[in-house]
Amino acid sequence: MRKTKIVVPIMLTELAELEKVSVSDYRTADIVEWRADFLSADEILEMAPKFFEKFKESKILFTLRTVREGGNIQVSEKKYLQILKEILTYNPAYIDVEFFTHGPSFAALKDFRDKMVLSYHNFDEVPSDLTNRLIKMHEEGTAFVKVAVMPERECDVLDLLQITRDMTLEYGDHFISMAMGDLGRLSRISGYLTGSCWTFASLENSSAPGQISLKETEYILDILEK
């Protein structure tokens, strides 16, 4: 059995697209991520009951990735919180919360920490204070802590792998990390070494640069983790 869980994103751009999605295509995914930021706020709330009904047999991670962290939606703090609160009424397995961008929303949702993937995304670099950021996020006691960063050199990828390993050994196996882009692909399949417990794989369109397909990810992890 693989140790690393595979998360497969769904990125819908209009309400009608949901009907065309085949649930069976996602049957081997451990977790289905609804990347809702390709819709408007109103469309998200309209689609939610249909989405959760369609994927009622799946573990769902709800993600509203904002422009500031590399996503496609720009909303106020109030609207961000409103959407997450509404989504929580459908009892998703997990919700992504952008800790450094939407701290007030995190504070308002602390009762749901057991469902939270507390996240930080940096599409420009691997910040020098990444370890401190990870520790700060870990101290909030959420289910998982996730970071995705952009390497500029090979050593940036190796640094991320080492930081992830150090954090896992010190604080436990609830960290998710990845270096984006082609340069960072190794980080997506090395969880068995670093302790990163989830990886994100694409079915069709990737949700982040450097993402590997579901079929390829399954094949590689089956070799590395058996």
Curated annotation (Swiss-Prot):
Keywords: Amino-acid biosynthesis, Aromatic amino acid biosynthesis, Lyase, Schiff base. SUPFAM superfamilies: Aldolase (SSF51569). The keyword Glycoprotein does not apply. 3-dehydroquinate binds at E33, W34, R35, R65, R188, S207, Q211. One of its GO terms (biological process) is aromatic amino acid family biosynthetic process. It catalyses: 3-dehydroquinate = 3-dehydroshikimate + H2O. The keyword S-adenosyl-L-methionine does not apply. Pathway: Metabolic intermediate biosynthesis; chorismate biosynthesis; chorismate from D-erythrose 4-phosphate and phosphoenolpyruvate: step 3/7. Its EC number is 4.2.1.10. The active site is at H121 (proton donor/acceptor), K146 (schiff-base intermediate with substrate). GO terms for molecular function: 3-dehydroquinate dehydratase activity. Homodimer. Belongs to the type-I 3-dehydroquinase family. Involved in the third step of the chorismate pathway, which leads to the biosynthesis of aromatic amino acids. Catalyzes the cis-dehydration of 3-dehydroquinate (DHQ) and introduces the first double bond of the aromatic ring to yield 3-dehydroshikimate. This is 3-dehydroquinate dehydratase. It comes from Lactococcus lactis subsp. lactis (strain IL1403) (Streptococcus lactis).
